Amino acid sequence: ICTRNDYKKRPIVFDKLPLLNIHRWISIGRLDINTRGLLLFTNNGNLANELMHPSNKIEREYYIRVFGKINKNTMNILKNGVKIKDGYAAFKSIQTIDHACSKKNKWFKGVLCEGRNREIRSMWQAVQCQVSRLIRIRYGNIFLPKNLKLGDWSELSSESVNNLSNLVSLKDS
C-alpha cells in the first residue's frame, strides 16, 4: 500500500525499501490498492514535486484490462475527454493491444499526463466500462523492468536519475 501508515496493518511499500541515513523516501505518485506496477521513490523533494506536478505533463503509461462494450465512439470519448467527479480527463493516447473480439475483457495501453486519484477507473466508468486490471508500466522515461518481480525493487542508475531530472529541468538531483 502506498502510504506511510496503514490503520489496517497491511504491508506498506516503504517497509520494502532500504533505510536512509538522512532524509526519507518520498513516493513519486501513488498507486491505489487495486493497481500494480511501477513506483518511483526518491529522497529529493524538489524532484518528486516536479515529476508529479500536472503542469509538467509527465507521461504515465498503463496496461488496462477493461470489461464492457467498447467501440470507436468509446475510444474517441476517452481521447477527447470525459467528465469525471473532479473535472475532465482524457488519455493522451489509448490503443487496443488485445484484438480478440470474443473475450469479455480487453487489454489497452493508455497514456495520461497527470495522476489524479482513480482517474483511469473513473474515465472508464464514465463510458459504462469497468477496469478489471491496471498496471503502470512507465513513468516519464522510466519503464517497469520486465524481470522485476512483484514486491521487489531496483535502484535506478545515475544516468536514469539524470534523465528523469532533465524531464523537469532539475540539475544535480
Which positions does each model-derived feature cover?
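Basic, flexible Lys/Arg- and Gly-enriched helix-loop patches that mediate nucleic-acid binding at interfaces
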Residues: 1-173
